[in-house]
A protein has these predicted regions:
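Terminal helices and disordered tails flanking the catalytic cores of nucleotide-processing hydrolases
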Residues: 1-86, 90-91, 249-335
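Short hydrophobic/aromatic segments of transmembrane alpha-helices and their interfaces
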Residues: 14, 139, 221-222
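Short, contiguous strand/loop micro-motifs
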Residues: 16-19, 115, 172, 214
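Sparse recognition of residues in long alpha-helices and their boundaries
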Residues: 39, 50, 104, 140, ...
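Acidic/His-rich, divalent-metal-binding segments that scaffold phosphate/diphosphate chemistry
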Residues: 46-179, 186, 190-196
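Short alpha-helical linear motifs
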Residues: 111-112, 165-173, 203, 223-227, ...
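Alpha-helical scaffolding flanking metal-ion-dependent phosphate/phosphodiester catalytic sites
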Residues: 124, 147-158, 176-187, 191-273, ...
Length: 335
Protein backbone atom coordinates (compact mmCIF):
# COMPACT_ATOMS: atom_id res chain seq x y z
CA UNK A 1 0.00 0.00 0.00
CA UNK A 2 1.22 3.58 -0.64
CA UNK A 3 3.19 4.99 2.29
CA UNK A 4 4.55 1.64 3.49
CA UNK A 5 8.30 0.97 3.52
CA UNK A 6 9.62 -1.65 1.08
CA UNK A 7 11.82 -4.34 2.60
CA UNK A 8 13.25 -5.50 -0.73
CA UNK A 9 14.61 -4.21 -4.03
CA UNK A 10 12.60 -5.19 -7.12
CA UNK A 11 14.08 -4.99 -10.62
CA UNK A 12 12.94 -6.85 -13.72
CA UNK A 13 16.42 -7.27 -15.21
CA UNK A 14 20.03 -6.33 -14.54
CA UNK A 15 20.03 -3.65 -17.26
CA UNK A 16 16.97 -1.83 -15.88
CA UNK A 17 16.77 0.41 -12.80
CA UNK A 18 14.85 -0.97 -9.81
CA UNK A 19 11.12 -0.29 -9.62
CA UNK A 20 11.54 0.05 -5.88
CA UNK A 21 14.52 -0.17 -3.52
CA UNK A 22 14.87 -1.44 0.05
CA UNK A 23 13.88 1.33 2.47
CA UNK A 24 11.85 3.35 -0.04
CA UNK A 25 8.41 4.62 0.86
CA UNK A 26 5.92 3.24 -1.67
CA UNK A 27 4.06 5.71 -3.87
CA UNK A 28 0.83 5.06 -5.77
CA UNK A 29 2.81 5.03 -9.05
CA UNK A 30 5.21 2.40 -7.66
CA UNK A 31 2.33 0.19 -6.54
CA UNK A 32 0.62 0.46 -9.95
CA UNK A 33 3.88 -0.32 -11.78
CA UNK A 34 4.47 -3.39 -9.62
CA UNK A 35 0.97 -4.63 -10.41
CA UNK A 36 1.41 -3.98 -14.15
CA UNK A 37 4.68 -5.93 -14.17
CA UNK A 38 3.05 -8.92 -12.52
CA UNK A 39 4.79 -8.64 -9.13
CA UNK A 40 2.49 -10.59 -6.81
CA UNK A 41 4.26 -10.01 -3.49
CA UNK A 42 6.28 -7.23 -1.91
CA UNK A 43 7.58 -7.41 1.64
CA UNK A 44 6.94 -4.21 3.57
CA UNK A 45 7.95 -3.03 7.02
CA UNK A 46 5.30 -3.78 9.60
CA UNK A 47 5.50 -2.17 13.02
CA UNK A 48 5.04 -4.12 16.26
CA UNK A 49 5.94 -7.43 14.57
CA UNK A 50 9.13 -9.32 15.42
CA UNK A 51 11.99 -8.23 13.08
CA UNK A 52 12.94 -10.83 10.44
CA UNK A 53 15.56 -13.40 11.45
CA UNK A 54 17.77 -11.93 8.72
CA UNK A 55 16.94 -8.45 7.41
CA UNK A 56 16.21 -8.11 3.67
CA UNK A 57 19.04 -5.61 3.20
CA UNK A 58 21.41 -8.14 4.79
CA UNK A 59 20.16 -10.84 2.41
CA UNK A 60 20.80 -8.46 -0.50
CA UNK A 61 24.34 -7.84 0.75
CA UNK A 62 25.04 -11.57 1.20
CA UNK A 63 23.63 -12.27 -2.26
CA UNK A 64 26.12 -9.86 -3.84
CA UNK A 65 28.97 -11.51 -1.93
CA UNK A 66 27.85 -14.96 -3.09
CA UNK A 67 27.68 -13.61 -6.65
CA UNK A 68 31.33 -12.50 -6.40
CA UNK A 69 32.36 -15.85 -4.93
CA UNK A 70 30.63 -17.76 -7.74
CA UNK A 71 32.27 -15.46 -10.30
CA UNK A 72 35.73 -16.15 -8.90
CA UNK A 73 35.00 -19.87 -8.70
CA UNK A 74 34.03 -19.94 -12.38
CA UNK A 75 37.56 -18.78 -13.23
CA UNK A 76 39.59 -20.68 -10.61
CA UNK A 77 37.38 -23.76 -10.02
CA UNK A 78 37.89 -23.25 -6.30
CA UNK A 79 36.55 -21.03 -3.52
CA UNK A 80 38.16 -19.26 -0.59
CA UNK A 81 36.90 -21.26 2.37
CA UNK A 82 37.53 -18.31 4.70
CA UNK A 83 35.12 -16.13 2.71
CA UNK A 84 32.46 -18.84 2.84
CA UNK A 85 33.05 -19.34 6.57
CA UNK A 86 32.62 -15.61 7.20
CA UNK A 87 29.28 -15.55 5.34
CA UNK A 88 28.19 -18.68 7.19
CA UNK A 89 29.00 -17.09 10.55
CA UNK A 90 27.03 -13.94 9.63
CA UNK A 91 23.92 -15.98 8.85
CA UNK A 92 24.24 -18.17 11.93
CA UNK A 93 24.89 -15.20 14.22
CA UNK A 94 21.88 -13.24 12.91
CA UNK A 95 19.54 -16.20 13.25
CA UNK A 96 20.74 -17.25 16.69
CA UNK A 97 20.42 -13.63 17.87
CA UNK A 98 16.84 -13.31 16.56
CA UNK A 99 15.70 -16.84 17.41
CA UNK A 100 12.77 -16.69 19.82
CA UNK A 101 9.17 -17.84 20.20
CA UNK A 102 8.05 -15.20 17.68
CA UNK A 103 9.73 -15.50 14.29
CA UNK A 104 9.48 -13.76 10.93
CA UNK A 105 11.23 -15.41 7.98
CA UNK A 106 11.33 -13.06 4.99
CA UNK A 107 12.80 -14.23 1.69
CA UNK A 108 13.53 -12.03 -1.33
CA UNK A 109 11.75 -12.42 -4.65
CA UNK A 110 13.99 -12.32 -7.73
CA UNK A 111 12.68 -11.58 -11.21
CA UNK A 112 15.88 -12.77 -12.91
CA UNK A 113 17.00 -16.42 -13.12
CA UNK A 114 20.70 -15.68 -12.60
CA UNK A 115 20.03 -13.48 -9.57
CA UNK A 116 17.85 -16.28 -8.22
CA UNK A 117 20.87 -18.60 -8.23
CA UNK A 118 22.74 -16.35 -5.79
CA UNK A 119 19.89 -15.42 -3.47
CA UNK A 120 18.84 -19.08 -3.42
CA UNK A 121 22.15 -19.94 -1.75
CA UNK A 122 21.53 -17.31 0.94
CA UNK A 123 17.95 -18.49 1.49
CA UNK A 124 19.16 -22.10 1.75
CA UNK A 125 21.67 -21.03 4.40
CA UNK A 126 18.97 -19.23 6.38
CA UNK A 127 16.34 -21.96 6.19
CA UNK A 128 18.86 -24.73 6.90
CA UNK A 129 20.17 -22.86 9.94
CA UNK A 130 16.64 -22.40 11.29
CA UNK A 131 15.88 -26.10 10.86
CA UNK A 132 19.19 -27.03 12.47
CA UNK A 133 18.63 -24.68 15.40
CA UNK A 134 15.10 -25.98 15.97
CA UNK A 135 16.52 -29.53 15.81
CA UNK A 136 19.01 -28.78 18.59
CA UNK A 137 22.26 -28.50 16.65
CA UNK A 138 25.19 -26.77 18.34
CA UNK A 139 26.89 -23.65 16.97
CA UNK A 140 29.78 -25.54 15.36
CA UNK A 141 27.29 -27.88 13.65
CA UNK A 142 25.19 -24.92 12.49
CA UNK A 143 28.29 -23.27 11.03
CA UNK A 144 29.13 -26.36 8.96
CA UNK A 145 25.51 -26.72 7.90
CA UNK A 146 25.25 -23.08 6.82
CA UNK A 147 28.63 -23.32 5.05
CA UNK A 148 27.39 -26.27 2.97
CA UNK A 149 24.02 -24.65 2.29
CA UNK A 150 25.39 -21.38 0.88
CA UNK A 151 27.53 -23.24 -1.66
CA UNK A 152 25.26 -26.24 -2.27
CA UNK A 153 24.74 -25.21 -5.91
CA UNK A 154 28.32 -24.01 -6.58
CA UNK A 155 28.67 -26.79 -9.18
CA UNK A 156 26.16 -25.00 -11.42
CA UNK A 157 28.96 -22.67 -12.54
CA UNK A 158 30.10 -25.58 -14.75
CA UNK A 159 26.68 -26.18 -16.30
CA UNK A 160 26.23 -24.37 -19.66
CA UNK A 161 24.24 -21.18 -19.05
CA UNK A 162 21.97 -21.75 -22.05
CA UNK A 163 20.79 -24.91 -20.31
CA UNK A 164 20.87 -23.65 -16.73
CA UNK A 165 18.81 -20.55 -17.56
CA UNK A 166 16.70 -22.01 -20.38
CA UNK A 167 13.26 -20.32 -20.35
CA UNK A 168 11.50 -23.69 -20.65
CA UNK A 169 11.36 -27.17 -19.21
CA UNK A 170 14.56 -29.10 -19.91
CA UNK A 171 14.60 -32.28 -21.96
CA UNK A 172 15.99 -35.49 -20.47
CA UNK A 173 19.50 -35.03 -21.89
CA UNK A 174 19.72 -31.44 -20.62
CA UNK A 175 18.45 -32.42 -17.19
CA UNK A 176 21.15 -35.08 -16.95
CA UNK A 177 23.72 -32.31 -17.49
CA UNK A 178 22.16 -30.18 -14.75
CA UNK A 179 22.21 -33.14 -12.36
CA UNK A 180 25.99 -33.20 -12.62
CA UNK A 181 26.19 -29.94 -10.66
CA UNK A 182 26.30 -31.91 -7.40
CA UNK A 183 29.32 -33.86 -8.63
CA UNK A 184 30.99 -30.67 -9.88
CA UNK A 185 30.30 -29.02 -6.53
CA UNK A 186 32.02 -31.75 -4.54
CA UNK A 187 35.04 -31.47 -6.85
CA UNK A 188 35.21 -27.71 -6.27
CA UNK A 189 35.15 -28.43 -2.52
CA UNK A 190 38.10 -30.79 -2.93
CA UNK A 191 39.96 -28.22 -5.06
CA UNK A 192 39.35 -25.70 -2.26
CA UNK A 193 40.78 -28.00 0.43
CA UNK A 194 37.35 -28.34 2.03
CA UNK A 195 37.62 -31.72 3.72
CA UNK A 196 34.75 -31.66 6.21
CA UNK A 197 32.61 -34.69 5.28
CA UNK A 198 29.44 -32.91 6.49
CA UNK A 199 30.04 -30.00 4.10
CA UNK A 200 30.94 -32.21 1.15
CA UNK A 201 27.88 -34.37 1.75
CA UNK A 202 25.62 -31.33 1.94
CA UNK A 203 26.88 -30.15 -1.44
CA UNK A 204 26.95 -33.57 -3.10
CA UNK A 205 23.81 -35.21 -1.67
CA UNK A 206 21.17 -32.48 -1.29
CA UNK A 207 19.16 -33.94 -4.20
CA UNK A 208 19.07 -37.44 -2.71
CA UNK A 209 15.71 -38.63 -1.39
CA UNK A 210 15.13 -40.90 1.59
CA UNK A 211 13.30 -43.45 -0.59
CA UNK A 212 16.21 -43.71 -3.05
CA UNK A 213 14.56 -41.77 -5.89
CA UNK A 214 17.00 -38.83 -5.81
CA UNK A 215 20.31 -38.28 -7.58
CA UNK A 216 23.17 -38.86 -8.24
CA UNK A 217 23.59 -42.16 -6.38
CA UNK A 218 20.02 -42.95 -5.41
CA UNK A 219 21.10 -43.07 -1.77
CA UNK A 220 18.56 -43.91 0.95
CA UNK A 221 17.91 -42.51 4.43
CA UNK A 222 20.73 -44.21 6.32
CA UNK A 223 23.23 -43.17 3.65
CA UNK A 224 22.33 -39.46 3.56
CA UNK A 225 23.91 -37.09 6.08
CA UNK A 226 21.88 -34.87 8.39
CA UNK A 227 23.26 -31.81 6.57
CA UNK A 228 22.11 -33.06 3.16
CA UNK A 229 18.66 -33.96 4.52
CA UNK A 230 18.24 -30.47 5.96
CA UNK A 231 19.51 -28.66 2.86
CA UNK A 232 17.14 -30.77 0.72
CA UNK A 233 14.16 -29.24 2.54
CA UNK A 234 15.51 -25.69 2.21
CA UNK A 235 16.33 -26.25 -1.47
CA UNK A 236 12.87 -27.54 -2.38
CA UNK A 237 10.96 -24.90 -0.42
CA UNK A 238 12.86 -21.93 -1.83
CA UNK A 239 12.66 -23.32 -5.37
CA UNK A 240 8.89 -23.74 -5.12
CA UNK A 241 8.18 -20.20 -3.88
CA UNK A 242 10.51 -18.58 -6.43
CA UNK A 243 9.68 -17.15 -9.85
CA UNK A 244 11.56 -18.84 -12.68
CA UNK A 245 11.45 -18.16 -16.40
CA UNK A 246 9.75 -21.52 -16.98
CA UNK A 247 7.33 -21.48 -14.01
CA UNK A 248 5.39 -19.19 -11.72
CA UNK A 249 6.05 -19.07 -8.00
CA UNK A 250 3.96 -21.14 -5.64
CA UNK A 251 2.38 -19.52 -2.61
CA UNK A 252 4.23 -20.20 0.67
CA UNK A 253 1.24 -22.22 1.91
CA UNK A 254 1.17 -24.43 -1.19
CA UNK A 255 4.94 -24.95 -0.93
CA UNK A 256 4.70 -25.95 2.75
CA UNK A 257 1.88 -28.35 1.89
CA UNK A 258 4.06 -29.94 -0.80
CA UNK A 259 6.99 -30.28 1.62
CA UNK A 260 4.71 -32.03 4.14
CA UNK A 261 3.40 -34.34 1.39
CA UNK A 262 6.95 -35.24 0.32
CA UNK A 263 7.76 -36.15 3.93
CA UNK A 264 4.63 -38.31 4.20
CA UNK A 265 5.67 -40.13 1.00
CA UNK A 266 9.10 -40.87 2.49
CA UNK A 267 11.12 -38.51 0.30
CA UNK A 268 12.07 -35.89 2.90
CA UNK A 269 12.94 -36.44 6.56
CA UNK A 270 9.69 -36.29 8.53
CA UNK A 271 11.25 -35.05 11.80
CA UNK A 272 13.23 -32.32 10.05
CA UNK A 273 10.12 -31.21 8.14
CA UNK A 274 8.30 -31.00 11.48
CA UNK A 275 11.10 -28.76 12.76
CA UNK A 276 10.78 -26.60 9.64
CA UNK A 277 7.00 -26.25 10.04
CA UNK A 278 7.50 -25.48 13.73
CA UNK A 279 9.50 -22.35 12.89
CA UNK A 280 7.78 -21.12 9.70
CA UNK A 281 4.27 -22.34 10.49
CA UNK A 282 1.71 -24.05 8.32
CA UNK A 283 0.92 -20.55 7.02
CA UNK A 284 4.30 -18.93 6.20
CA UNK A 285 4.89 -15.18 6.03
CA UNK A 286 3.12 -13.78 2.98
CA UNK A 287 0.13 -16.15 3.06
CA UNK A 288 -3.27 -14.47 2.66
CA UNK A 289 -6.04 -16.03 4.76
CA UNK A 290 -9.73 -15.71 5.57
CA UNK A 291 -10.78 -15.80 9.24
CA UNK A 292 -13.98 -17.21 10.73
CA UNK A 293 -14.91 -13.59 11.47
CA UNK A 294 -15.08 -12.94 7.72
CA UNK A 295 -11.96 -10.74 7.82
CA UNK A 296 -9.05 -11.14 5.42
CA UNK A 297 -5.48 -10.99 6.68
CA UNK A 298 -1.88 -11.59 5.65
CA UNK A 299 0.60 -13.62 7.70
CA UNK A 300 3.46 -11.44 8.98
CA UNK A 301 5.05 -13.74 11.56
CA UNK A 302 4.80 -17.08 13.34
CA UNK A 303 4.97 -18.45 16.87
CA UNK A 304 7.26 -21.45 17.24
CA UNK A 305 5.28 -24.61 17.94
CA UNK A 306 1.97 -22.96 16.99
CA UNK A 307 1.88 -23.95 13.32
CA UNK A 308 -1.80 -23.08 12.82
CA UNK A 309 -1.79 -19.80 14.78
CA UNK A 310 0.33 -17.20 12.96
CA UNK A 311 0.67 -13.47 13.57
CA UNK A 312 -1.58 -11.61 11.14
CA UNK A 313 -2.11 -8.13 9.75
CA UNK A 314 -5.75 -7.32 9.03
CA UNK A 315 -6.88 -5.17 6.12
CA UNK A 316 -7.30 -2.23 8.52
CA UNK A 317 -3.60 -2.43 9.46
CA UNK A 318 -4.14 -4.00 12.90
CA UNK A 319 -1.75 -6.81 13.90
CA UNK A 320 -3.17 -9.78 15.81
CA UNK A 321 -1.56 -12.95 17.18
CA UNK A 322 -3.88 -15.95 16.75
CA UNK A 323 -2.01 -17.73 19.56
CA UNK A 324 -3.44 -15.07 21.88
CA UNK A 325 -6.90 -14.65 20.32
CA UNK A 326 -9.65 -16.95 21.58
CA UNK A 327 -12.27 -18.04 19.08
CA UNK A 328 -10.51 -16.60 16.02
CA UNK A 329 -9.33 -19.17 13.48
CA UNK A 330 -8.25 -19.47 9.85
CA UNK A 331 -10.93 -21.06 7.67
CA UNK A 332 -9.42 -20.64 4.21
CA UNK A 333 -6.18 -19.81 2.40
CA UNK A 334 -6.80 -17.20 -0.31
CA UNK A 335 -3.51 -17.45 -2.25
Amino acid sequence: MPGEISMETVRLSDDQPPIVRIGQSLTEDMVETLKEKGVRYLWVQISSVKPPVVKPEKIEQLKEEIKDIFGDAAEKLRVDRREIANLSHEIVNDIVKNYSDKLSLILLIQQNDEEYTYVHEVHAGMISTLIGLESGLKINQLSRLSFAAIIHDIGKILVPKDILYAPRRLNEKEFELVKKHVEYGSRICENSDIRDPEIISGVRDHHEKLDGTGYLKGSKKGEISLEARIIAIADVYDALISNRSYKSSWSPYRAISEIIKMASFGKLDRELVQAFVSVVGLYPVGTTVLLNSGEKAIVVGNTRGRATQPILRLDNGENIDLAEEKGLTIVQVLD
